[in-house]
């Protein structure tokens, strides 16, 4: 797998220990490298390879973990096609309210909700949420459930100090939290 790495804020270091290799990410240029996720390593790693930031990058450095799930070449190609064609769809009335709030509160200014993010690179300042409803973690650290989604939206600073979401939107009331939680939970690509 080839990686093109660039940071949006400070220097980080992209590292997947069991796959080998790590690479710094800088704000001023793209660093490129590749890792081989062969079947033996994938079997040994289990369902996921675990990665983290290996550069002391700020107050939430210790919380910068991520997972890599391996797929066969055929499964990966199919996944890419699904990602290209996926569209965010709010199914329930509450989810539709959440979708509207996502626009009104300017969440969409930082977060994409479709896999094929066509915004300019400079606008991609926050994680793409296209498959948020399929993730196992909220903000990469909290178990993925409605209560934790609500808690994160209500006070992200409590869980990840120094994150970019804190104080970027007005305080949300309970109805808004319910609607946004419903909308975000419905953002799925693989399990629709």
What are these regions (language model features)?
Residues 74-103, 191-192:
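Electrostatic cytochrome c docking/interface patches
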Residues 61-64, 123-132, 152-187:
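Axial heme c-ligation environment in periplasmic c-type cytochrome domains
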Residues 27-84, 104-108:
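Extracellular/periplasmic metallocenter environments
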Residues 83-97, 141-155, 159:
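Short Fe-S-cluster ligation motifs
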Residues 54-58, 110-117, 134, 154-156, ...:
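Detector for the c-type heme attachment site
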Residues 90-115, 126-129:
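Sequence/structural segment immediately N-terminal to covalent heme-attachment motifs in c-type
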Residues 9-28, 66:
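Histidine- and aromatic-enriched segments that form or immediately flank copper-ligand environments
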Residues 26, 64-75, 112-150:
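Gly/Gly-Pro-rich "capping" loops immediately C-terminal to redox-active cysteine motifs
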